[in-house]
Amino acid sequence: MNLSAEHVSVLRGRTEIVHDVSFSVSDGQWLMICGPNGAGKSTLLSAVSQELPYTGLVTLDGTDLRRMKPRPLARRMAMLRQLSDLAYAYTVEEVVAMGRYAHRGLLQADSGGAEAVERALQAVQLQDKRRQNILTLSGGERQRM
């Protein structure tokens, strides 16, 4: 899988919050987006995940995300906010399963969900921590989750 952004900019009113950002990240790669508070990191990620309007191009395996319907996109990509935004203490498995809500709906049965969660836990090497409270994870483990 490859996620690419080309010349992405985000406006809030007349103020440009994100200016001309480009990146590409593929399976097995990590991408670090860093900067001071207010630099636009979360805004960029919100745009890439289709939560905010933007100019430029964001593609997943070469397909413009704006052309993808929400459900097929949610099957391939989800964004989970920072842990500080979570109001309750969940297990690792519960947090990973939250990524499936956009795919299936909050109150819908989740056929194949357990297998998808297991694959995700294995992909980030957290399968042995599945029942552990997220507040007990190290910083690196939280990032992988």
Model-derived features: positions:
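Conserved ABC transporter NBD signature motif
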Residues: G56-D64, L73
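Signature (C-motif/LSGGQ) region and adjacent switch/coupling loops
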Residues: Y88, G105, R130-R131
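Helix-to-loop junction immediately C-terminal to a conserved catalytic motif
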Residues: V48-S49
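Short beta-strand immediately N-terminal to the Walker A/P-loop
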Residues: W30-M32
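Conserved ABC ATPase signature
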Residues: N133-L137, E141
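Conserved structural motif at the start of ABC-family nucleotide-binding domains
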Residues: L3, V18-D20
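Conserved ABC ATPase "signature" region
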Residues: A97, S111-K129
